[in-house]
Amino acid sequence: MISRITDDYEKMAVAGIVALTEPSFWLGEPRKHAGTFYDYFDHITNFEAQRAAEYGIKHYCTIGVNPREANDIDLATEVLTRIEEWFERPSVVAVGELGFDLITDDEETILRRQLEMAFSAGLPVMIHTPHRNKLEGTMRTIKVVQDMDLDPSRILMDHNTEETIEVSHDNGFWCGHTVYPVTKLSPERAAAIFEKYGPDRMMVNSSCDWGPSDPLSVPRTVWRMRREGFSEDVIRKIVWDNPIAFYSISGRVDLQPGWE
């Protein structure tokens, strides 16, 4: 939410959102110094949580070197020398976003190092699947996880589309679906995926970044699912129970399954 205005928090609160998880993100312009990353990590673990709390929203976050910035291998490696300090913050519920952007060897190096750190720290992992060559990037991520003999039930494979959901789901990962006005899923497409694959290990999220994006994508998807006849139990599982179950692996989520 660092790229969004305060009005967005108000709109989210009015729409009934009471908690969110903000993944570590790029800043539009590539960062050039390790200290810029560290200041950003402080921002989303401190100030952003305070900003959300003013609207009654519980703010969690994930910490990681985003794959968009992993190709500056020297800088990314320097950032990783201190990143574990932020893993200990009470609002940090996962390591991420990690993964591939351009699908390079340097990105894989940084991915592997952060996966090792995350599992050592006992934190789950949020994986970014790339905008371009999405299936190739997803398959390479799965290969890395399997090569490292890591438990996929501790990993969220995010930004799935119709192209990737089968391999993500069949390999035992939690499956995120980003509803985004231009480049990712619409509420209708997300609902169609849930209809085909069911609610187990499924989640839906929004994107609140520098381009066209909508912080109300989740309630809009809920509205679409209700119109299409999904039961309240299925909707609740996808947008509430499943995220709580996944992020509770961290031991830091103080929310309960179910809603009134």
Role assignments for model-derived ranges:
Residues A53-Y55, D147-D151, K196-G198, R227-D233:
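Short helix-capping segments at alpha-helix termini
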Residues M1-A121, I127, M139-R140, V144, ...:
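Mid-domain alpha/beta scaffold segments of enzyme catalytic cores
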Residues R112-K196, R201-M203:
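Catalytic pocket-lining loop regions of alpha/beta-barrel enzymes
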Residues F100, H131, W210:
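Short, glycine/acidic-enriched loop or turn micro-motifs at the edges of active sites
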Residues Y197-P215, I235:
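Short acidic/histidine-rich active-site segments
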Residues S24-L27, V179-K184, C208-D209:
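Short, acidic/turn-prone active-site loops that include or flank metal/cofactor-
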Residues P219-E260:
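Mid-to-C-terminal alpha-helical segments outside catalytic/metal-binding sites
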Residues P30-K32, K184-A191, P212-D214:
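Short, charged, surface-exposed secondary-structure boundary motifs
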